[in-house]
Swiss-Prot record:
The lineage of its organism: Bacteria, Pseudomonadati, Pseudomonadota, Gammaproteobacteria, Chromatiales. InterPro entries: Elong-fact-P_C, NA-bd_OB-fold, Rib_uL2_dom2, Transl_elong_fac_P/YeiP, Transl_elong_KOW-like, Transl_elong_P/YeiP_cen, Transl_elong_P/YeiP_CS, Transl_elongation_fac_P. The modification N6-(3,6-diaminohexanoyl)-5-hydroxylysine is found at K34. This is Elongation factor P. May be beta-lysylated on the epsilon-amino group of Lys-34 by the combined action of EpmA and EpmB, and then hydroxylated on the C5 position of the same residue by EpmC (if this protein is present). Lysylation is critical for the stimulatory effect of EF-P on peptide-bond formation. The lysylation moiety may extend toward the peptidyltransferase center and stabilize the terminal 3-CCA end of the tRNA. Hydroxylation of the C5 position on Lys-34 may allow additional potential stabilizing hydrogen-bond interactions with the P-tRNA. GO terms for cellular component: cytoplasm. Belongs to the elongation factor P family. The gene is efp.
């Protein structure tokens, strides 16, 4: 199995540690004035979601995690599991709440998302960077509202609440950045 040396550590790298797959969130190289250099690493367990801090001596290595990132289509949720399907093979997967996490507020049925699979089980479901969602509830706009004004909360079709400019009305389609949860623009029809 391939491995990664501390010099190859970077954010997003998937590694195996203590029998579990982890992803590197942060990596800081430290060279003290006296003594050996080391890497201070923040890792997230892909199975449990727990975040841990570890230090590795310069030159240490970790085994590469045998995880696959693939594009799957979100089909539906039955309350306990989110069901996903491969558009090529039509193979279906069930992801639990821990794997989906905050992605639930950005995913609607038939959306394509990036799924991290380990031993055939979904560990992490990531929505696309930008999604187009419909406004289902917001305060009515008042005459004279411009883009330079303030903002108001708007509820989207998935239940997510985002801050939008005052001129946005119910029924409009909005482009949302899922990484920050912020309004980007009105969607082009």
């Amino acid at each position: 199995m391939a491995g990664y040396s501390t010099s190859e550590f970077k954010s997003g790298l998937k590694v195996m540690m203590d029998g579990d797959p982890y992803t590197i969130m942060e990596n800081e190289f430290v060279k003290p004035g006296k003594g050996q250099a080391f890497n201070r690493v923040k890792l997230r367990n892909l199975k449990t979601g727990r975040v841990i801090d570890r230090t590795f001596k310069s030159g240490d290595s970790l085994e590469a995690a045998d995880v696959i990132e693939t594009q799957l289509q979100y089909l539906y949720s039955d309350g306990e599991f989110w069901h996903l399907m491969s558009p090529e093979t039509y193979e279906q997967y069930s992801a639990d709440a821990a794997a989906v996490g905050d992605s639930t507020k950005w995913l609607k049925e038939q959306d394509t998302c990036t799924v991290t699979l380990w031993n055939g089980a979904p560990l992490l479901v990531s929505p696309p960077n930008f999604v187009t969602l419909k406004v289902t509830e917001t305060d009515p706009g008042i005459r004279g509202d411009t883009s330079g004004g303030g903002s108001k909360p708007a509820t989207l079709e998935t239940g997510a609440v985002v801050r939008v400019p005052l001129f946005i009305d119910v029924g409009e389609m909005l482009k949302i950045d899922t990484r920050t949860g912020e309004y980007v623009e009105r969607a082009k029809e």
